[in-house]
Structures are given as C-alpha cells and as structure tokens.
Swiss-Prot record:
Keyword Transmembrane helix set for record: yes
Post-translational modification: N-glycosylated, O-glycosylated, and sialylated.
S-S pairs: none
InterPro entries: Herpes_gH, Herpes_glycoH_C, Herpes_glycoH_C_sf
Cellular localization per UniProt: Virion membrane; Host cell membrane; Host endosome membrane
Membrane side Intravirion: residue ranges: 668-686
Membrane topology: Single-pass type I membrane protein
Top-rank taxon: Viruses
Gene this chain is encoded by: gH
Transmembrane segments: 647-667
Lineage, broadest ranks: Viruses, Duplodnaviria, Heunggongvirae, Peploviricota, Herviviricetes
Family: Belongs to the herpesviridae glycoprotein H family.
Subunit structure and binding partners: Interacts with glycoprotein L (gL); this interaction is necessary for the correct processing and cell surface expression of gH. The heterodimer gH/gL seems to interact with gB trimers during fusion.
Name of this protein: Envelope glycoprotein H
Length: 686
C-alpha cells in the first residue's frame, strides 16, 4: 500500500481525536463549543468566542498544516492532549532546548551611523495600503494574527529561505539540507512559547531584552557557533533604523556567505536581508509613503542577494518579488531604468540601446582613468548578455575585459576585505555590485588568484539573469540542482578553461592568452618573457574543421601613422601591454578616431595606457587586428599633424598678407629716404 494511503487515515484519526479532545475540554470548562478553524488558520464563522486564553495546536505532516482551537491553556496539563502534542504529526518542543534561562544575548546593540536618505526631489509613492490579515504559525511559538505587507520565498531541495513582513512584524525562516533550521521573529507584541507544562504556560521565547521590538531566535543549540549566530542576529534590528545602513550590512553579509560558504554565514546574511526589508517597510508604513528610488533599491537588492545566497547554498533560486505589485508600479527615474528592467524581468528590447550606451560610456571613462557607475554597468551587462544578439554579448565582454585592470581588481579585493572586517562601520552605502563589476563579468581570469574574487565571479555571472524572469523564484524538485548556464560562457563558448584572458572577435573566434599552447589554433609565443611564466597568444574558435596547429612569432613592426582625419585605420584593434614577468598589464579596444589619435600621440597621449613614459623598459606592446594579425608594436613611423580648422587657415593667410604689406611699406620708406638724401647731398656740393 502506498505510504500516502497510510498517512491519510492517520491524519483523519489525529484530527478526529483532536476535535474530540477539544469538545471534552470545552465541556469540562462549561464553555460553548466552537467549530474548528479553516485550514488557513482563521476561525470558522460559527465558532463561539473563547473565554480567556485560548490554546491553538499546529497539526500537520510537513506538506500541510492546520491550526485548531482547543480551549484554555490549562488543557496542556491533560495527559491525553500532551500526548498528542508530542506525537508524530505535531511539532517538537525541542526546537528551543531547555533551559531557556541559559540563553543570553547582547544587552545594548551598538548603533551605526545614519546614512543619507533618498535624493532630493525623488518622487514619493503611497505606502498606506493595509496588510492582508493572516495567521502566522511557527514550530515553537503560539500562532499570531499578522497584517502581512510582503511575503517572499526561495525554495529548492538544498535550502529554504522565507520572509514574511507585516505591520510591526517580521517572520523569517532559513533551513539548509545539511544543517539545522533557524527562525527569527520580530514583533511589537510579546509572544509566548509552545512549551511543556513543566516550563509554565507564559514562557517567552529566547531573545534579548525588548527594545523597540521583541526579538526572538528559535533554533537547535547544536554548537557554540550556532549559539553565537543566534545571539548576533537577534541584535540586528536594534543596530540602526536606517534602511541604507541595514542594506549595506546585508550586502557585506551576503559577500561573506558567497566567499566563505557555510551555514552560519548563510544564516547571518539571510537575517540581515530580512531585517533591512523590515526596517524599510516600518519607516514607509509610519510615513505612509516611500521614495520611488528607495523602494526600487530594496526590491532589487532583495532579489539579487536572495539569488546569490541560494546560489551559495547550491541551488538556482531566489525571490521572485518582495513587495508584490507595490514596487512594479513605482515611477522609474532615467538613472534607474536598467535596474528596473533587470528587477522586474521586463521586455529588455526597449532598454537595449540604453544598455549599449551605458557600457560604452563606462568604457570611455575607464580608459581615461575616470570613475564610472559600476552598478549601472552590471545591469547593462546583464541585459546585453541575456537579451542582446551574439554581437552585443561579445562586444560587451570585450569592453568589460578591457575595463578589468590589475588596479581595479586590487581595489575590489581591498573593498571586499574592508567589508568582511568585523569592525566595519557603514558610514557610506556599500553594494556588492561595486565589487562584482566589471571584473566578475569579464573574460579576465589571471587576476583570480584570490579565491574570494573567483567565488564572487562565479556567483555574479549566475546572477545576471533578470530577477523577474520565469523560474527565478524557485526550483522544482526535479531540476533544482541542475547547473545554470553561465551567460558569459554562452557568449564565448570557444574559450578554453585555462585561458588567462580572452578577447572575443566577431565571427566566433577569440584571442586567448594562456601559459601553454592550446590544442587547436595558431599560436604566438611572446618573446622576452620569463620562462617560468611564459605567455602564449592563440586564436581559438568553435570551428574544429579549421583547426590550424601552427606556431608563429609576432612580427616586430613600426606601424604607419594615419594622416586622414576622417578614416579610423586602427579602429576595432586591441592594444595590449605585457611585462617581461609574464603579466598582462592592460588591454584597450580602439573604438574611435579620438582614441586612435591618442594612441599615435605617444608621450603626449592623455590616455595612460598609450603613454610609454608611464611604463618601464620591460613593458612591451602588441597590436591585435580583427583579422587575426598580431604585431609586436615598436612605434609609429611618423607623428600625425594636428588637424587645422578652416578659420585658423583664413586667419593665418590674412595675418601673413598684412605682415607682407607692412614690410613692403617699410622697405619703400627706407628706399625713398635714401634716394632723396643723396640727391640733396650732390646738389649741396655743386
């Protein structure tokens, strides 16, 4: 007989027994009998109101749960009811291990500084819709009626992450397949435990002394690390009432969970995210409004961080939404259009031009050493890799690879270390996207010696899919642990795993720098490089029939400078600098006439990568052409004259004519004076 067929009669017997016990308890007290509540937890319309405290029992087998109203709390002393409470179909008291008095928490959580609020002039949206009344049930606390404002869940066989936001209420559940679960409840009202009669009927769940809210942490006290985690997360909500500070802490905690996989980091990051959303919703609920950029920021961060956390737990899932339709209806500022398109999974076609322009502008600023918006770049890259054509994806990766320099990777690593510091203070907003972009979404892998950056890159590439896309919320049991396709690898599938750096070309081929020769494709061994770190430049493609196993040496040349101001001869070429130590210093895509002129300006160039005076004598340069030609660049044969405007030519001609006229007049004056002077002298003598 199937197991499900056996469980059904047992459930019915259990329900019947509980109803009988309820009737017996009610008759013993002389109280009117009431009908059972609905499966959703609400009382039946015909139920009479209970007198005094009422006992609720949570019944279920994991797939469905029901709440039944039995009677007064004194019924707990009934051995028959106690037997049911300890039965197979009911929850266990051991969720919170006794003695509760042994638990201790941080007494006065430290306050973090308040960050700047929404930008001035930001459009405000109403946040005054009442929550939907629901009964919140848990394993060890009596059910509570909550006005739910938001409810989100990410689930797969490896992990479950659930957040319920209500009016002055947060319920958060986290569970991992290989570790014990954790639950956090934040409430304005005091709550009571479902505890054995020996502990009393008015026992408060474990938590720190009440501040603005009551905070309860429920879990199995398995070891000291779990105990410390439960103590720490209980203090989060009282650390700051600024949602930006809480979001910054959530990003840092998610960063720790991604680079240092483990249940405790996962739990801390999940609670941080839930608390950040709770602090924001409470502020918006009290003010009855919220700024549109702030609501979009919280919504997008919730979806992004939940996906990164679930990915770290081993499954492709994440929140499909937090504030339901509230965030989707907000007006979007021009600067937030890419974030909104990624967050809500909108049709990306209307945003592709904006995404291309964002990547191009970020690249132009990066080449000139100027700061750029790394968060906007992340969302632009996400849209182009997922919705753009093959040409869009490859050109985007070419630019992000060029933007990923050793200096930028070092800055990201330093930012990561600072964020992971236990003494980090969020004086300024911190976002994971400032660490992820652009190196994590590029084809540069030689800077990934730090496992932190390598883990971040893998997580970031899998988070590029739009958060609102179908299947982003939860994974089914059948396909939950199937590996998601890496959009970066999909855009350039020909690149081998051992590549240090790759530069995709149009047509399905790529320039690839490696330490050893690939199995297929022409390869150039770069001379003057340390034999311990050799550099090989190969051209690889997916066309196995065209495999050319040819070893070559790049030809050293003085390339001609172009004098044509209207033709860009070296556009779409890639300029590469590398050192004799076998290190790739930088790559620059020449995409405009202005960049070409800067390239040929030599020591006068304002682009640092092109200026040879900023590099030592052991640094060499290559020019990679789109047709696969590789040149060891020595110099340009001549310096191109600066373009002269027509107005300057006219002014020069007029000035020269005036100068000639003045000189001629002076000459005539001198000649006339000399002629008259000699005539007078001759006449005087005669």
């Amino acid at each position: 007989m199937p197991a499900s067929s056996v469980r059904l009669p047992l459930r019915l017997l259990t329900l019947a027994g509980l109803l009988a016990l309820a009737g017996a308890a009610a008759l013993a007290r002389g109280a009117p009998q009431g009908g059972p509540p609905s499966p959703q937890g609400g009382p039946a319309p015909t139920a009479a109101p209970a007198r005094g405290p009422t006992l609720f029992v949570l019944v279920g087998d994991g797939s469905a749960w029901f709440v039944f109203q039995l009677g007064g709390l004194g019924a707990l002393n009934d051995t028959r009811i106690r037997g049911h409470l300890l039965g197979r179909y009911l929850v266990s008291y051991q969720v919170v291990p006794p003695p509760v008095s042994a638990w201790y928490f941080v007494q006065r959580p430290r306050e973090r500084p308040r960050l700047s609020g929404p930008p001035s002039g930001a459009e405000l949206v109403a946040f005054d819709a009442p929550g939907v009344r629901r009964t919140y049930t848990t394993a060890a606390v009596w059910p509570a009626e909550v006005a739910v404002l938001a409810d989100a869940e990410a689930r797969c066989p490896a992990a479950v992450f659930n957040v319920t936001l209500g009016e002055a209420f947060l319920g958060l559940r986290v569970a991992l397949r290989s570790f014990l679960p954790l639950e956090v409840i934040i409430s304005a009202e005091r709550m009571r435990m479902i505890a054995p009669p020996a502990l009393g009927s008015d026992l408060e769940p474990p938590g720190p002394p009440a501040g603005r809210f009551h905070v309860y942490t429920l879990g199995f006290l398995s070891d000291g690390a779990m105990h410390q985690t439960m103590r720490d997360v209980a203090a989060y909500v009282h650390e700051s009432d600024d949602y930006l500070a809480q979001l910054s802490a959530a990003h840092a905690a998610a960063l720790a969970a991604v680079v240092q996989p483990g249940p405790y980091y996962f739990y801390r990051a999940a609670v941080r995210l839930g608390v950040a959303a709770f602090v924001f919703s409470e502020a918006a609920r009290r003010d009855r409004r919220a700024s549109a950029p702030a609501l979009l920021r919280v919504e997008s961060d919730a979806r992004l961080l939940s996906r990164l956390l679930m990915r770290a737990a081993g499954c492709p899932a994440g929140f499909a939404g937090l504030f339901d339709g509230r965030a989707e209806r907000v007006p979007v500022a021009p600067a937030d259009q890419l974030r909104a398109a990624w967050t809500f999974g909108e049709d990306p076609a209307p945003r592709l031009d904006l995404a291309r322009a964002t990547v191009a502008e970020a690249y132009r600023r990066s080449v000139r050493g100027k700061p750029f918006d790394q968060q906007a770049l992340f969302f632009a890259v996400a849209l182009l890799l997922r919705a753009g054509g093959p040409g869009d994806a490859r050109e985007t990766l070419l630019r992000t690879t060029a933007m990923c320099t050793a200096e930028r990777a070092a800055a990201a690593a330093e930012l990561t270390r600072a964020a992971l510091s236990p003494t980090a203070a969020w004086n300024e907003p911190f976002s994971l996207l400032d660490v992820l972009s652009p190196c994590a979404v590029s084809l540069r892998r030689d800077l990934g010696g730090d496992a932190t950056l390598a883990n971040l890159g893998a997580a970031a590439r899998l988070a590029l899919a739009p958060a609102g896309a179908p299947g982003a919320a939860a994974a089914t049991d059948e396909g939950a642990e199937e590996e998601e396709e890496d959009p970066v690898a999909r855009a350039a599938p020909e690149i081998p795993a051992e590549a240090l750096l790759a530069l995709p070309l149009r047509g399905g081929a790529s320039f690839v720098f490696t330490r050893r020769r690939p199995d297929c494709g022409p390869a150039y061994t770069l001379g003057g490089v340390d034999i311990a770190n050799p550099l090989v430049l190969a051209i690889v493609s997916n066309d196995s029939a065209a495999c050319d196993y040819t070893d070559r040496m790049p030809e050293s040349q003085h390339l001609p400078a172009t004098d044509n101001p209207s033709v860009c001869v070296y556009c779409d070429c890639v300029f590469v600098r590398y050192s004799s130590a076998g290190t790739i210093l930088e790559t620059v895509l020449i995409e405009s006439k202005d960049m070409e002129e800067q390239l040929m300006a030599g020591a006068n160039s304002t682009i640092p990568s092109f200026n040879p005076t900023l590099h030592g004598g052991d640094v060499k340069a290559l020019m990679l052409f789109p047709n696969g030609t590789v040149v060891d660049l020595l110099s340009f044969t001549s310096t191109r004259l600066a373009p002269v405007s027509p107005a300057y030519v006219v002014a020069s001609v007029v000035g020269a004519a005036i100068t000639v006229g003045i000189l001629y007049a002076l000459f005539k004056m001198l000649c006339s004076f000399s002629s008259e002077g000699y005539s007078r002298l001759i006449n005087a003598r005669s």
